[in-house]
Amino acid sequence: MPSIKNYLSLVKFSHTIFAMPFAIIGFFLGIFDFSYNLEMIKLPYRPYSGIPKLKISPISALANYHIITFVLVLLCMITARSAAMAFNRYLDRQFDAKNPRTAIREIPAGIISEKNALFFTILMCVLFVTCTYFINSICFYLSPVALFVILFYSYTKRFTFLCHLVLGVGLSLAPIGAYLAVTGTFAILPVLFSIAVICWVSGFDIIFALQDEAFDKENNLYSIPAVMGKAKALNISSFLHFLSAAAIIFAGFYGYFSWFYWLGTAVFCGMLIYQHAIVKPTDLSRVNIAFMTANGIASVVFAVFVLLDLILLNKATWALNFLF
């Protein structure tokens, strides 16, 4: 029987580091923009307002509301991403078995059966939708749309080289979704962060796909490196990362952030430049460093500085009530 560790490996749980920080950014932006009318607390969590003879201060009620929402957002991120990754592994199992780079993955290696991988995918989808139900109605109603986007990605490499952008769109739902979880509304600032995520993820996925250029060509799979070659693919990746940096910078001005934000932006942009400096069309030896290390640092450090800007510089005083 497969272990929990096997399933964590199946879905590459460590790669959660890419989108999760942006979900947390979206969540805290939502706290900043939230209309702190106590009547709103009663909408998503009726039990907290309906328990008889229980007196809760407004601050405590608000803190409870946000803590529960935060946990549900994290669960949504984990379950949605796990569903998408497991489905991708299930759908690509035959290609993975033929590719020397991926033949050691859990399904082609026989560690996790096809049936178990599919069941795991369905289970994660059910848990995701269930979590959205307990957040608010708009998240619940939009949950099938989110699942469609992230599951549909696995098919795209079979017919379009724009598959990288579809992956970016899937991960870009993180900041918008987390913001919706808190506010129940859309806003420009989380959308700007989502645009940054689309371009950022698409760009580094192109870099990662450089490794499979020959295999993709041989097996009629579409990717920008397979269709356009390594050199052009890296140029497109660079352009997408330029757009990502531009969206981050524009969001900084639009949101009137201060120096903490700009420090985070400097690190984020620096990591984008770094990964393009170490990967060349003739030298792919450091693709994994560019893919995992550089982008992991970029997302985590940027999120930390954004949160410092929001909390320590009093741009979201209610966030302090949530934390303390």
State where each predicted segment sits.
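Residue-level recognition of pore/gate-forming positions within transmembrane alpha-helices
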Residues: 23, 27, 77, 125, ...
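Intramembrane alpha-helical segments
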Residues: 8-9, 38, 75-77, 82-83, ...
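Helix-coil boundary and interhelical linker segments in multi-pass alpha-helical membrane proteins
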Residues: 27-74, 127-141, 176-195, 247-262, ...
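Multi-pass membrane catalytic core of lipid/isoprenoid biosynthesis enzymes
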Residues: 65-79, 93-143, 218-264, 304-305
